[in-house]
């Protein structure tokens, strides 16, 4: 194996999926707090009250909720993010388990509304500051390097309702204040930062709607992305000014796309899919300017961006230090008519007969990870981090309390071997954090039974459970992997 000395092995979570304590110690509600539970066959619902006072629960839409309506938590619905896995009260126990595994890093996010309950305040909530300072201090006690995502899908609800969310340029100001507060308050405790989680999902989400997405939807999506690009660039500049030791990266939802056939139209579609879905966000954040093909993407949907002259200067000055991404699966694109369509992780495509699929329809493709790593390093030539990778699966607790998950071990083994091949081919890969190292609420379906962790959490989809933690077989396996720096994968 060729993993470099000092390689950052660890795991990843997100505040809205694990913390719980959604209305504790001054935290305000976030967009994720009005999403119900769901399943692979039933979408999560967003709940709201319309202008006439009538309650509604509908699948999430890129258009948000109707004009005059307001988000609401309704009776008779289960909101799994409200409690998460109660990391807020279990963080010491959880970090001790990470320390036992030998984690070198732990990727987590900071809940914007825990620091700024509405999002537009000028002074942060000190209870929130204290919580995160305690978490980072605890991680340091175990020599675990925090890797912190500043925004992970959880915009404060107040900003959505009163400003229209990221469609409003004012959110650049509010976000940069939030980011600056994080950089200042946690200086010396955190040096690895990611500005926006899976920033490209704004457009990927629209692709899932196909022809149902209008030009107006694309106009809003690309304007949202522009505001987030500028906010990210400003945050990078602020973070470097506050602490020259800070390393700040982007975070992309990574999917490897393949053409279904060698039909030239499939080859061209595949290239354009990479540009629209993956390269667009990476190019702006890593190269500091919009790529030439951006004009084609905008023209496809009659998009006319509002870009200020100073925005372009900020993009140039605020390029990221490193490129991080999630990787779970690959997908197949084609111009031909196909009937066997599989979807997952903000993408849909033809079934790949050469791959196996999970119970949630996600293709297992470690070679796709190697392909992605080599392509991105060749394109950007900055350090890469795989900050999400994992297999959502059913776990069974045996009578003696043991949890055998050889399928999860095999999944990770294959993907670690793929990373090793990429490193041998010259890729500068510095970190690997498995997704959901401890079981948590699924962002896509709101389920607990879709489990990723090395650590089992006794919480079920109906909200029952005592939140106790248990080690799975994969816990001991990953501990061995880390101790050997990737040498021992048996």
Task: List where the protein language model places each region.
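Internal amphipathic alpha-helical repeat/solenoid segments
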Residues: 84-99, 117, 128
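Active-site mouth loops of central-metabolism enzymes
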Residues: 76-90, 167-170
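Catalytic domains of carbohydrate-active enzymes, especially glycoside hydrolases
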Residues: 90-111, 317-323
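Glycine-rich, proline-tolerant flexible connector loops at the mouths of alpha/beta enzymes
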Residues: 110-124
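Active-site region of glycoside hydrolase catalytic domains
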Residues: 1-75, 100, 118-120, 129-490
């Amino acid at each position: 194996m060729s993993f470099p000395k000092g390689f950052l092995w660890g795991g990843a979570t997100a505040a809205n999926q694990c913390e719980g304590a959604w209305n504790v110690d001054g935290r305000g509600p976030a967009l994720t707090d009005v999403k119900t539970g769901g399943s692979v066959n039933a979408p999560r619902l967003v709940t709201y009250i319309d202008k006439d006072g009538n309650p509604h629960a509908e699948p999430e839409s890129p258009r948000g909720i109707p004009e005059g309506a307001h988000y609401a938590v309704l009776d008779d619905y289960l909101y799994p993010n409200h409690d998460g896995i109660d990391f807020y009260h279990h963080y010491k126990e959880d970090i001790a388990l990470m320390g036992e595994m030998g984690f070198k890093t732990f990727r987590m996010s900071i809940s914007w509304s825990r620091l700024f309950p509405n999002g537009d305040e000028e002074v942060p909530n000190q209870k929130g500051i204290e919580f995160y300072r305690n978490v980072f201090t605890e991680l340091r006690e175990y020599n675990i390097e925090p890797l912190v995502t500043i925004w992970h899908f959880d915009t404060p609800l107040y900003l959505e309702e009163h400003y229209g969310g990221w469609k409003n340029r004012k959110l650049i100001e509010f976000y940069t204040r939030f980011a600056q507060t994080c950089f200042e308050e946690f200086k010396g405790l955190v040096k690895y930062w990611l500005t926006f989680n899976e920033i490209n999902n704004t457009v990927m989400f629209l692709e899932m709607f196909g022809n149902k997405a209008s030009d107006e939807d694309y106009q809003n999506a690309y304007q949202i992305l522009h505001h987030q690009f500028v906010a990210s660039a400003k945050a990078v500049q602020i973070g470097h000014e506050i602490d020259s030791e800070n390393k700040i990266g982007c975070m992309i939802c990574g999917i490897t796309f393949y053409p279904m056939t060698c039909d030239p139209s499939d080859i061209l579609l595949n290239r354009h899919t990479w540009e629209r879905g993956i390269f667009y966000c990476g190019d702006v954040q890593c190269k500091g300017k919009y790529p030439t093909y951006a004009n084609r993407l905008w023209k496809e949907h009659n998009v006319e961006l509002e870009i200020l002259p100073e925005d372009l200067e900020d993009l140039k000055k605020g390029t990221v230090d490193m490129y991080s991404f999630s990787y779970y699966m690959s997908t197949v694109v084609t111009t031909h008519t196909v009937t066997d369509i599989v979807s997952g992780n903000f993408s849909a495509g033809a079934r790949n007969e050469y791959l196996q699929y999970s119970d949630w329809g996600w293709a297992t493709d470690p070679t796709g990870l190697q392909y992605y790593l080599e392509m991105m390093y060749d394109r950007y030539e900055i350090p890469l981090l795989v900050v999400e990778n994992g297999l959502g699966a059913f776990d069974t607790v045996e009578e003696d309390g043991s949890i055998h998950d050889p399928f999860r071990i095999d999944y990770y083994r294959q993907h670690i071997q793929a990373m090793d091949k990429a490193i041998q081919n010259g890729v500068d890969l510095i970190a690997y954090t498995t997704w959901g190292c401890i079981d948590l609420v699924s962002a896509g379906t709101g389920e607990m039974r879709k489990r990723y962790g090395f650590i089992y959490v006794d919480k079920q989809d109906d909200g029952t459970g005592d939140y106790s933690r248990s080690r799975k077989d994969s816990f001991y396996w990953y501990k061995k992997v880390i101790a050997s720096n990737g040498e021992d994968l048996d």
